[in-house]
Amino acid sequence: MNGAAPIIPDVRVEPDPSLVVRQLGRVAYEPTWRAMQAFAAQRSAGTADELWLLEHPPVYTLGQAGKREHLIAATDIPVVPIDRGGQITYHGPGQVVAYVLVDLRRRGYGIRELVARLEQAVIDLLAASNVEATRRAGAPGVYVDGAKIAALGLRVKHGCTYHGLAFNVDMDLEPFAAINPCGYPGMAVTQCRDLGLNWSVEQTERALTDALQRAIYS
């Protein structure tokens, strides 16, 4: 990309009354995961959906389909087996994580449709700054020139989701070299900074919140 770095789009939408947005800052992984589980277990038909925006300290998470052989190098970063779909991924500072706590029964669509909508939110956000992003058949997430910029993994219980997506903004990508990201040997990863997008975590959280709200509730 040439010239000045694009400014992150600031297109605000009216808050959906059935959505509570929480910006949690940098929080440890395991307590946040347990809080998601508790929220999903305790919510009722009238409970508002929630969107949690946050960062995690360095951690690998291993999904239900995960195999430890996809951790291919020794590391001091903890590995946490969890209950989302998918394989192994990395979370760390400078990555915006959006946990999507949505009642799909109220929305009237299923988990595959939600995954497509979450992917489209990231694709649209990048397109607004002239970055072309795509999906990849059989490998949920968002890619730029074949490199993964956003990972997705969800769990559904009683029609309600938790977990969500992780969007690489301005982070140390080196820990990805110790794993086969999402179980794919040799998969490249990228981030906004490397695409010439000098976005802060705070700016990205605001813009991603709006993009996700449009995608989920349209």
Curated annotation (Swiss-Prot):
Cellular component GO terms, alphabetical: cytoplasm
Stored Gene3D superfamilies: Bira Bifunctional Protein, Domain 2
UniProt-annotated location(s): Cytoplasm
Pfam families per the UniProt record, alphabetical: LplA-B_cat
Active site: 182 (acyl-thioester intermediate)
Enzyme class: transferase
One GO molecular-function entry: lipoyl(octanoyl) transferase activity
Catalysed reaction, written as an equation: octanoyl-[ACP] + L-lysyl-[protein] = N(6)-octanoyl-L-lysyl-[protein] + holo-[ACP] + H(+)
GO biological process, one term: protein modification process
Domain BPL/LPL catalytic: 45-218
Binding site for substrate: 84-91, 151-153, 164-166
PROSITE patterns reported in the protein's UniProt record: BPL_LPL_CATALYTIC, LIPB
Enzyme Commission number, as recorded: 2.3.1.181
Additional note from the record: In the reaction, the free carboxyl group of octanoic acid is attached via an amide linkage to the epsilon-amino group of a specific lysine residue of lipoyl domains of lipoate-dependent enzymes.
PANTHER family: LIPOYLTRANSFERASE 2, MITOCHONDRIAL-RELATED, OCTANOYLTRANSFERASE
Described purpose of this protein according to its UniProt entry: Catalyzes the transfer of endogenously produced octanoic acid from octanoyl-acyl-carrier-protein onto the lipoyl domains of lipoate-dependent enzymes. Lipoyl-ACP can also act as a substrate although octanoyl-ACP is likely to be the physiological substrate.
The protein's name: Octanoyltransferase
UniProt gene name: lipB
